[in-house]
From Swiss-Prot:
Residues 1-75, 239-260, 281-330 are annotated as: Disordered. Residues 295-307 have a biased composition (Polar residues). It comes from Eremothecium gossypii (strain ATCC 10895 / CBS 109.51 / FGSC 9923 / NRRL Y-1056). It is found in: Nucleus. Belongs to the SLX4 family. This is Structure-specific endonuclease subunit SLX4. Regulatory subunit of the SLX1-SLX4 structure-specific endonuclease that resolves DNA secondary structures generated during DNA repair and recombination. Has endonuclease activity towards branched DNA substrates, introducing single-strand cuts in duplex DNA close to junctions with ss-DNA. Forms a heterodimer with SLX1. One of its GO terms (cellular component) is Slx1-Slx4 complex. Phosphorylated in response to DNA damage.
Amino acid sequence: MDLRRAERNLKILGDANSDEDMPVAHSVEETQGQALFSESDEADAEEDAAESPQSGVGGRTTTAESGGEEHREQVFLSTQVQGRIDEFEATEGARRQFRQLVTGFTYAQEDGEANAGGRTAKRVPKVRRTRRNNTKVRSLTEFNTENFERLRKEDRARSLLTMLSGKTQKVNNLLRGLQQERSRERAFHGCSVYNEGEWREIVRLLHERLPKATRSDVACIKSYVYGDGLDETPWCASHARPPDCPAQSQERQGTCGPGDDELRIFTLSQLLEDQSASEDVIPDSMDAGDAVSLGSPQPQAGLSQHSFCPDSTATSPLRPPATPLTRAPASPLPVRVYTAPASPLDYIPDSEDDPYVLQGPSQARSPPSLLEVRRTLKNIGVRPGRSAAAVRKAAAAVARIEAASDAASLGTASDADRRSALFLRMTALVRRSPRLLAHIYCLRPVALDDLRAVLEADDDFIALLDDSLIRQWADFTGICVKNDTSDSQRPPQPLESQ
């Protein structure tokens, strides 16, 4: 739009300059620029340019050729075009200044002066190679192997000092300080050492716990326990056989002679059959091979002669001991016994010969209230009616079922007994229906409504039972009960007509 206005203005100015006979009009055109560039003139110029673009171009060319250098200095531009050009230049100048400001912007220094220089690349610290630490533990197994003795001594010293002094912190600080001095590290200033009194107490306890014994005392004790002619160590000598033991008992293995001085091994069946001790074959103990015999016990060896001492106090399962083992009689102590005189009415003869069971006297008891009966019926799974007559009728039916099942009465029986009586009643009703029984034996599911209908047909009392009680009875007896009566496994006819 600005280019068109500029072209139109140039055209008008060229026409005005080419007309030399009208100086007044030329001055008017120069002084009244706003009137010449009105909206009506602009619209007319646009229409003329649209109708004859070729003529306009030819006119501009003719005007440019006819005008001279003397008229070019007097070219007048529209104030609107000049204003737009000024705004564009101001915008470009502001953008240029802003770009320079952003380019030269930096953070202020500590002294408050801004750094006018450009951005500098961030310096990356140079990676320095660390020295290899030769004291670093590379293998835990190697460390434990090399320092096993030292660690064991330190642990023993720590445990011993802790047990004697009872001060764990002091012991740990002391050992830590010694370890740091050994490794030539900096001096340890945080340990708390023992004073003179504490060291004296530790030494006294050491003498009490570890009494000093001379070598002669140790040799005397060794000769008394193991004998004078002990050539081997006590551990090896304790496993050696007695020197006077016959060698033939060691050589023969599995042979059993008829001697009376040898012990025999018997099985339980031989003992029950009362067989003699001279039997050579023991068929129940082994399938093949010779019988196993035990040598006769040797006389007791003294402690000063032998290292093996058989125990003659062991009891044998075959023969009773010669001297029965009894406890020493305890000293008699006076004991006061209180006896209460029993009345002849409280005396009950205790005899196993009585063919009947003794029963105590029955005590009179008040009948249960209506609320208790209702609560009892709800606990066992019976739905009592709202009226008192319905509750009494249901209670009488339950009592009748309990009497038929040899259970206790409603007032004295427990809820489990009453529930068991109801289970027995429903089981008896199922056994009366051969069709239902065959249906159950075939492991076919039975609808709950059909099962209720069959049971209620034989006994009206089943209508008072809850569904939960019937399901519990079905789970107890192994009957598969289903809710959906439209199942495909449901028989096409009712159970009574099958």
